[in-house]
Design a protein with these regions (language model features):
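A structural signal for multi-pass alpha-helical bundles of membrane permease subunits
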Residues: 44-318
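Transmembrane alpha-helical segments of polytopic membrane transport and secretion proteins
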Residues: 1-49, 278-282, 304-318
Length: 318
């Protein structure tokens, strides 16, 4: 009895596309599994614990010192709290509500930092989202070179642009020493990195989704607000955290463009002045420093789930 060799059946393009998509899905799932295994490995867990302990101990010491009397702060370390626990709220009262030339009076500086940090983080994110979408999905001549130019701006130190920008703000626009000057400066310095990171995320969104929206009659504005922004929330939240923390902790840009005036000066400027008082307000520094990190902690922990999702999405795309 003779055997008949099987005949190779032709495979149409549709089946081939489905096969390729299935293989890509398997590869993506495997890549995600590998990333999760690395993040949950024994060495990764040990490293995370070590980093957490190293970060927590000085933060806890700062928190304890902020409630200790001035005499105890000057004469002993914070670890003596365990043998001689004494608490007081005088440091916070003097830092926030005391008036006078020698007092810290951080309340006005704290509000100035909020007024600077919130727009200083929102403006680059808003402009960066639109620019990243245009560079990723709106074809126009020179888009590639424009993206390379924007990426190259990250190499230029911001210190080189301080004097030219200050001259423009003071001599041309007349806004030196005001909040808009600080907002514009932070927007200019933050935009290149924001555009670069968001472009990488937005360009990885499947084009079939956008094509389906165009078939349904959606224009670029509708696609941007109804598709791109909802899908990019994890990336936007991650970048917003970095931008907000950078603006909140910044001293150089705010000091240059605010002019150092009390009405516009941020919290970091007042902390730098207190550090330079040769220990006169040493007992107020722990309370002042802890007040300065409250807002970044609130922002980070409130957006933590988006931050982790954004990091994982950026690590597994491609």
């Amino acid at each position: 009895m003779s055997s008949v060799a099987p005949v190779d059946l032709p495979i149409d393009d549709e089946n081939k596309k489905n096969t390729d998509a299935f293989q890509e899905a398997i590869a993506g799932t495997t890549k995600v599994r590998r990333v999760k295994q690395r993040l949950t490995s024994r060495w990764a867990t040990v490293a995370a614990i070590v980093i957490a302990v190293v970060w927590t101990i000085p933060t806890f010491g700062l928190f304890v010192s902020s409630f200790r009397p001035a005499v105890d702060i000057r004469t002993s370390g914070w670890w003596t709290f365990f043998t001689n626990p004494t608490f007081t709220l005088e440091n916070y009262e003097e830092v926030l509500f005391a008036s006078g030339a020698s007092s810290a009076n951080l309340s006005s500086y704290f509000m100035n930092s909020l007024v600077i940090a919130i727009p200083g983080a929102l403006f680059p994110i808003a402009l960066g989202c639109m620019a990243a979408y245009a560079l990723a999905w709106i074809p126009f001549r020179g888009a590639g070179w424009l993206f390379v130019f924007i990426f190259a701006l990250q190499i230029v130190p911001l210190q080189m642009a301080l004097i030219p920008l200050l001259q423009i703000f003071s001599q041309v626009l007349g806004i030196s020493g005001t909040f808009p000057a600080v907002w514009i400066a932070h927007t200019i310095f933050g935009l290149p990195l924001v555009i670069f990171l968001l472009h990488n995320f937005i360009s990885a969104i499947p084009g079939d989704i956008l094509e389906a929206a165009k078939v349904d009659g959606a224009n670029h504005t509708q696609i941007f607000f109804r598709i791109i922004l909802p899908l990019s929330v994890p990336a936007i939240a991650s970048i917003a955290i970095f931008q907000f923390l950078w603006v909140w902790n910044d001293l150089l840009v705010a000091l240059v463009f605010s002019g150092g005036t009390v009405d516009v000066a941020p919290l970091t400027q007042r902390l730098a002045e207190m550090v330079g008082n040769f220990g006169r307000n040493q007992h107020l520094l722990p309370a002042s420093a802890f007040i300065s990190i409250i807002v970044p902690l609130i922002v980070f922990f409130s957006l933590q789930r988006y931050f982790v999702r954004g990091l994982l999405a950026g690590a597994t795309k491609g």
